Structures are given as C-alpha cells and as structure tokens.
Amino acid sequence: QQIKKETGIDTQIWAARSIAQVFDKLNLDYDRTEKTSAPSFTKNFLQNHPHPLVKQIARAREINKAHTTFIDTIIKHSHKGRIHAEINQLRGDNGGTVTGRFSYSNPNLQQIPARNKDLGPRIRSLFIPEEDHTWGCFDYSQQEPRLVVHYAILQNLYGVDEVVEAYHEGDADFHDIVADMAEIPRSQAKTINLGLFYGMGKNKLQAELGVSKEKADDLFRQYHNKVPFVKQLMDNVMRRAQSSGKIRTLLGRLCRFHLWEPNQFGIHKALPHDQALTEHGPGIKRAYTYKALNKLIQGSAADMTKKAMIELHKEGIIPHIQVHDELDISVMDHTHAEHIKEIMEHAVSLEVPNKVDYESGPNWGTIR
C-alpha cells in the first residue's frame, strides 16, 4: 500500500517487470539478464538497496514466502493440533540425504527459519511442549569438529594433540583453537574448517573468504602448515574411497563411490564403470572422492544422533523433532533434562568427550 501510495503502481512483488516499473518511477538503476535483457532482482540486491521502498519490497517478499512456505504448510498438515511429517532415513525417490542424515517432507520441518530474528521465532513459537512440560532443545556441541578430531586421533595424525587437550579441559571451541594454531582470525579459520569438512574446492573457498587468490593461497599454506591433521585426514579418507570405492561411518554404515570420470581435469558427467570405460578409455578414476571426508563426518554425525534417539526411546523419551545436531523434547524438570543430556552424550564413544548444550522455554520460538 505504501508503494502504491508513493508511486501509483500496484506492485506484484514476485514479478520482475512489475518491480522494474517501481524502479523506473523512482529513477533507480537495476540489473538485466544477459540473454533477454529482462529486469533482474536478486534477494541480496533488494535487501541491501538503500531506498526504503525497495526494502519494503524485500520485506514483503520475505513475509509472503514465510506465510506460503511455512504457515500455510503447517496449517495444511495439522491434525488434531499435531503435525506428523514424513521422515526420510536415506536418499530415495521421495527425498532423503546421501549422508544418512534425516530429512523431512510434508512438511519440511527442518527448513522452518531460524536465522530470521523476526519471522523465525514467530513461526517456531507455534510448536509447544506437552502439557505441564517445557520445550527443551538439546544440541550436540561442535558435533562435526569433534568427529574430525576423533578420526585424526585414530589415525595418529600430527598436530591434533593441542585440540584433544583443549576438549578434555572443558568448553573448547574448535574454531578458536584452530585460529590460534594457524595464527589467523577466527572467522577465516571457521570458513576454512567448514570448507574442508564439506569438500569445498579452492576457488569456492576463496570466494567464501572474500579475499584475492594470492591472499587465499597464503591462508591455505599457513593453515595446512600449522593445522596439518585436517588435510591429512581429508587426503587419507579420499585415498581410501578412491582405492576401495567405499568408506564406513562411525557405526559401520557403507558409503559407496560407484561412479567414474576421466583422470584429466574438466567438467565430465560421472558414469558407471563400464560406461566410463567405453566413453573415456582406461584413464578413469572414481568420481566425487573429494566428498569422502564430508560423507564420513556427516554420516557419522547422523549415526550419533540416530543412536541417541534409539537410546532415548528405550527410556520412553520421544523427541518432537530432530534438526541436524539438535533434538527437541518435552522436558518435565531439571533432573529430566540432565538425564536426557547424559543419554545423548554417552550414546556413542569418541576419542574426545561429547558435549550436549541445553536450553528450554515455553515453546520452540523462545529458544535462541
């Protein structure tokens, strides 16, 4: 209404040509697509634009998406005040992940916004605990970094001792420790850590760091010299995947690397062995082995969370929802919460201590 009042245009917030009319009226510049020269408005462009009316368009889009994607979906799937989503154990025709993490559909409860400080809590506040309980959020602290350290210890890799010592002393932060070891800012250490864990290439990692190629190369060199165990582990797991075509997660689940590609650098479609042999000849290698560490760590994190859910179920404790490394459960009192934490922390045994952070409130939206 404010936009129409000031410009006389009844804007369709998802139609680029309609938004372009507003920009033209306000004498504002905007991008166009290369092929058709059609108006182009990205989310970041609209959100970061200095003009207040443009910010209102971005805000209206955000609210509309939250309503249609989440609120309407929640109402649609509500049954007697509860929602029973479909949970996908592994990758299949109807959803799921290749790493073994749970995914949800109809509705996708894991996508309910958390980072949006305004809309996220409002939508999450629709989720309430059982009567006379509080909503408890139990979150594995640094689940993936702990698993990296666990495997580095098992392989006796150089440089991991300092991290192990910190974890045994108490509330250690992996990214802080690595930043100190590598003598780089924490933000850069965290970006490199997560990039390596997730199998990110050097170019993408450089873009995430937001620095020049030369600066990125210096950072990588310094990181790998001072924190050698991460790259060593990544290389070891990649070699195992390349030689045997498989790796196993913490609790023994098999991750296969059954597709092949030519040895030479370039963009090639990964193919089954016989097809790749016919297409490219004998100079082929297994594809996607650069993702081996990611599959090992995420797959093992999934193992840990699922094992915790099984152990909780044995005690009659049923989570309402699982979101990555977090379980949300109706909690009776402090003693009940401590019991849940203890079960989760001891569901599997690692070479470093496990830690579960706990927060509670009257509903999901009041937490963080």
Which stretches of residues belong to each language-model region?
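Conserved catalytic alpha/beta cores of large enzymes that bind or transform nucleotide phosphates
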Residues: 126-148, 160-194
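Cytochrome P450 catalytic domain signature, combining two hallmark sequence patches
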Residues: 29-33, 153-170
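Conserved "right-hand" nucleotidyltransferase catalytic core of DNA-directed polymerases
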Residues: 1-119, 128, 132-134, 141-144, ...
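Conserved catalytic core of nucleic-acid polymerases
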Residues: 28-29, 178-318, 358-368
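Short hydrophobic/aromatic beta-strand micro-patches
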Residues: 208, 328-332
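A common structural junction motif
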Residues: 226-227, 342-352
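Helix N-cap motif at beta-to-alpha junctions
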Residues: 213, 332-337
